[in-house]
Amino acid sequence: GDRKAQDEMLHAAYESGVAILTTRTTAAHAMSYQITKKLGAAHGHACMLTLPHLWAHLAAQAEYQPMLTELSRILGGEKPMDGAILLKGLLAVLELDKIPMPDDATLDMLAASVNPERLGNHPEALTTAQLRAIYVQAFTPMTDTERAEAIAAWEQYGK
């Protein structure tokens, strides 16, 4: 019942809407809608499932490595993939990294459901096949070694 807090939340929601209208949304955000609707993951959780894999997709290309290195440095890392590893660590520590792999029909539906207009803020266009591959990666459990590395990165964050 705090009227001031309600007004501030309403203003923040409005400003967020204006920002998305201007810049479009991120690929992780665009890919999250049907994960939430069909698989029941919270919206933010759904975004975090794909974000490290979108990061890795870009990091595999030389032209994006300087940008990802800078983002990783902001997060306390040094190499282009450090930010993605940190994000995976957060998912692992919170035990949010274990959503079962959807069946092929669901994976196809997820990939086909992404609105290309909502990918307008992503550094490159993504095909339906690339989106599907990123969904598969997002639902594939980390190996024990990957998980340990990601958790160690997260635990080191901020120290």
List the predicted regions and their residue ranges.
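Residue-level detector of well-ordered alpha-helical segments, enriched
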Residues: 5-8, 27, 31, 46-50, ...
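Intrinsically disordered or highly flexible coil/loop and linker segments, enriched in small
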Residues: 19-25, 80, 96, 100, ...
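Carboxylate- and glycine-rich phosphate/diphosphate-binding segment that chelates Mg2+/Mn2+
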Residues: 1-23, 123, 129
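Short alpha-helical scaffolding segments that buttress acidic/His motifs in well-ordered protein cores
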Residues: 9-17, 51, 87, 91, ...
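Gly/Pro-rich interdomain helix-loop hinge
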Residues: 38-39, 44-106
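Non-catalytic, surface-exposed connector residues within folded enzymatic/regulatory domains
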Residues: 3, 25, 45, 62-65, ...
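Short, amphipathic C-terminal "tail helix"
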Residues: 105-159
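Glycine-rich phosphate/pyrophosphate-binding beta-alpha loops
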Residues: 14-44, 116-121
